[in-house]
């Protein structure tokens, strides 16, 4: 959740632990609260626990069955 605080400063919830994070240069890991939460998130992406939804992702898995693969 994003909330507005004084002086045009925003607070967001850390995506991992849900702690409030002030959105400013003083929060170097934003939107995460810490390096630890940042690395947990990176690990989830690396382990393919997270992914961006895509309807046409299968072509990349088997280039031999996709004629367009050779053109790129």
Curated annotation (Swiss-Prot):
Per UniProt, Zn(2+) binds at 14, 17, 33, 37
Cofactor details (free text) = Binds 1 zinc ion.
| InterPro entries, alphabetized | DNA_gyrase_inhibitor_YacG, Znf_NHR/GATA
Keyword vocabulary terms for this entry: Metal-binding, Zinc
- Named cofactor requirement(s): Zn(2+)
Output the GO biological process annotations, alphabetical, semicolon-separated.
Answer: regulation of DNA-templated transcription
Task: Give the source's domain of life in one word.
Answer: Bacteria
Q: Which Gene3D superfamilies match?
A: Erythroid Transcription Factor GATA-1, subunit A
GO function terms (MF aspect) = DNA topoisomerase type II (double strand cut, ATP-hydrolyzing) inhibitor activity; zinc ion binding
Oligomeric state and interaction partners are given as: Interacts with GyrB.
Which function does this protein serve?
Answer: Inhibits all the catalytic activities of DNA gyrase by preventing its interaction with DNA. Acts by binding directly to the C-terminal domain of GyrB, which probably disrupts DNA binding by the gyrase.
Similarity comment: family membership = Belongs to the DNA gyrase inhibitor YacG family.
Q: What is this protein's record name? A: DNA gyrase inhibitor YacG
Q: Which gene encodes it?
A: yacG
């Amino acid at each position: 959740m994003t909330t507005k605080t004084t002086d045009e400063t925003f607070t967001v919830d850390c995506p991992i632990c849900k702690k409030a994070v002030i959105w400013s240069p003083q929060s170097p890991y934003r939107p995460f609260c810490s390096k630890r939460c940042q690395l947990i998130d990176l690990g989830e992406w690396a382990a393919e626990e997270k992914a961006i939804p895509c309807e046409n992702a299968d072509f990349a898995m088997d280039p031999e069955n996709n004629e367009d693969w050779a053109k790129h």
